[in-house]
Amino acid sequence: ELDKLYINYGDKVSLIDFKLINMENSNEAINLLKAFMEDKNIEKVIQDGKNLITILTKHDIQVEGFIFDTVVAAYLIDSAKSNYPLEVLINEYLMKEVKGEGDELICNAMASMKELYEYLKDRIDKEGMDELYYEVEHPLISILSSMEAIGFNVNREKLDELAVKFKEEISRTEKEIYELCEEEFNISSPKQLGKILFEKLDLPVIKKTKTGYSTNAEVLEKLMDKHPVVEKIIYYRQITKLNSTYVEGLKNVIDEDGAIHSSFNQTVTTTGRLSSTEPNLQNIPVKYEMGREIRKVFIPQESTDVLLSCDYSQIELRVLAHMSDDKNMIDAFNHHSDIHTKTASEVFKVPVEEVTPLMRSRAKAVNFGIVYGISDFSLSQDLKITRKEAAEYMEIYFDRYPKIKGYLESVKEEAKEKGYVLTVLNRRRFIPEIKSSNKIVKALGERLAMN
């Protein structure tokens, strides 16, 4: 709701406290604010524009003349921060201490808003992020606000039906687990599950914790081929989580208009990706059929409309081809070749038409593994082959695409030197891990740099 608004206009900071405005004068105040915010000739620099646009839209006020968002700009300059309070930005970038508390603190900070804007704008220009800011990030602000306001319609009846199906599926899976273990126990209890797996069923102990046997996802994955109950337990965990987080969870956040209004966060991830919260609608697992069923409860607003799902084809590899300038990979894409089949043909030394689905699958793992900085050991684990075979696959790959290895090495060196890497549009991805004295953490940093 519209609570307080702080405005620096004509070198004067004003605080509008809407809670103190009586009903008689509230319409007049709203109309004055509307005239100010909708005046295109008054250029506006806003701290957290999406939030303000979202709030004002509810009061039928449009924001015109919005030229700069200090939060988004500060995020582009340093995406490693968790948040970007105005007084902190002024302290860090303008070397000014902002004094006071509450309203006084914010008003004192607002007094330096113009100076902060000029500093951030200059940094964005000097660091070559003007295209990224003005053509990508700034236009996105109003789009995200609109997305949040519209929301995503949900078929409540379908969701209720799904709740029944999940309850039945969970019950059925529980019975199968009990039958395989020949007793009932609390499957959700790591302690009880550990005793069943490692004492009663005598499965090999992979890892121990202070409280007993570890039964985390990594441990269960390694036990998959040891007993049929393990796969059932992994499935049970998936569907119970899906049920609590999405089936029951979504019921609680459906608004009066029949839609779910998630928040889309532009300044949270270090990579520039969006994040979704309250609830997270970007991470609904689709590995199992029950997960795919959840997506079907989302429907278009109009019955005559359809939901369209689009995805880039092999985008990571296309970007890699562009950034590395590897002629062989660029040529493969320009001739519309299936890059995974092409790689399989090279790795396994067979004609393209003789590449089997298994060969293509392994080549795909190599292609994407290289992008994410995979080691020969990890590749051997993923493909269930020897480390020597994995190393040979990677060697053949780099022989076929010679510029890629050099490019990836240069990216790692740049990250070590600068502490960050750059994307095509000069977005900075800060990687503090790469300067760690811990070898494992440093290796993670190198993979993140290539990623």
Annotate each predicted stretch with a short phrase.
Residues G49-I61, V71-A80, I90-Y93, K195-L201, ...:
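Short active-site loop/helix that positions an aromatic residue
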Residues E1-E24, E28, A35-E38, Q47-G49, ...:
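Conserved "right-hand" nucleotidyltransferase catalytic core of DNA-directed polymerases
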Residues S79, I187, A332-N334:
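Conserved, non-catalytic sequence blocks in retroelement Pol enzymes and Pol-derived host proteins
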Residues I42, I46-Q47, L56, R295-L320, ...:
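Conserved catalytic alpha/beta cores of large enzymes that bind or transform nucleotide phosphates
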Residues N22, I61-V63, K96-E104, L120-D130, ...:
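Short, polar/flexible loop-turn hinges at active-site or ligand-entry regions and domain interfaces
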Residues D17-E24, I67-A111:
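Short alpha-helix plus adjacent loop in nuclease-associated cores
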Residues L2-N22, S309, E316-K349, E433-S436, ...:
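Metal-dependent catalytic core segments for phosphate chemistry
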Residues S142, A149, H261-S262, T267-T269, ...:
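Conserved catalytic core of nucleic-acid polymerases
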